[in-house]
């Protein structure tokens, strides 16, 4: 009886930990890792660490308790099978990017779902998040889209000046 209550307390502590991780992270993504070797999982963890992304394995039932407590019960239907949980600590899309990139090379890793921007997303949503540009990439895109028209205007002025020189 004493052991049972101790196990129950351990599980409650894990639910509190999961709840805190979800609250403290920018996003949460999950993927099924059935069939992946330990070596490949270690490679995934190393890659995740480079991007300040944390990978954990929890019992689905404990994650379900935490997500229900946080109002994300839509995630429940994805919590079947052996899942790993990816918490993005800095940029919300980093976890999805790490998982999607790894899944391209390792077909046994199956993207399932996640919580991004406070909403539950399915596998297609995880892939869409993975394709979002980083802040730096977005700035580059913005800068190049602004510079294009400016180049055209300056070229037009140059042509006008050259045309005026020729006519004089």
Curated annotation (Swiss-Prot):
Q: Which PROSITE patterns match?
A: RIBOSOMAL_L10
Keyword annotations from UniProtKB, A to Z: Ribonucleoprotein, Ribosomal protein, RNA-binding, rRNA-binding
List, alphabetically, the InterPro entries matched. Answer: Ribosomal_uL10 (IPR001790), Ribosomal_uL10-like_sf (IPR043141), Ribosomal_uL10_bac (IPR022973), Ribosomal_uL10_bac_type (IPR047865), Ribosomal_uL10_CS_bac (IPR002363)
List the GO cellular component terms. Answer: large ribosomal subunit
Q: What are the GO BP annotations of this UniProt entry? A: translation
What job does this protein perform? Forms part of the ribosomal stalk, playing a central role in the interaction of the ribosome with GTP-bound translation factors.
The record's comment on protein family reads: Belongs to the universal ribosomal protein uL10 family.
This chain belongs to which protein, by name? Large ribosomal subunit protein uL10
Q: Which organism is it from?
A: Mycoplasmopsis pulmonis (strain UAB CTIP) (Mycoplasma pulmonis)
Gene name of this polypeptide: rplJ
């Amino acid at each position: 009886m004493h052991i049972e209550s101790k196990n129950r307390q351990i599980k409650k502590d894990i639910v509190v930990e999961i709840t805190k991780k979800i609250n403290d992270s920018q996003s949460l993504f999950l993927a099924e890792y059935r069939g992946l070797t330990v070596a490949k999982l270690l490679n995934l963890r190393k890659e995740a660490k480079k991007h300040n992304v944390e990978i954990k394995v929890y019992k689905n039932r404990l994650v379900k308790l935490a997500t229900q407590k946080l109002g994300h019960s839509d995630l429940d239907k994805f919590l079947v099978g052996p899942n790993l949980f990816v918490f993005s600590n800095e940029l919300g899309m980093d976890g999805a990017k790490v998982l999607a990139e790894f899944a391209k090379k390792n077909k046994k890793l199956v993207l399932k779902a996640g919580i991004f921007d406070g909403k539950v997303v399915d596998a297609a949503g995880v892939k869409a998040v993975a394709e979002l540009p980083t802040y730096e990439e977005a700035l580059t895109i913005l800068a190049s889209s602004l510079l294009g028209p400016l180049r055209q205007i300056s070229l037009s002025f140059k042509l006008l000046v050259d045309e005026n020189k020729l006519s004089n």
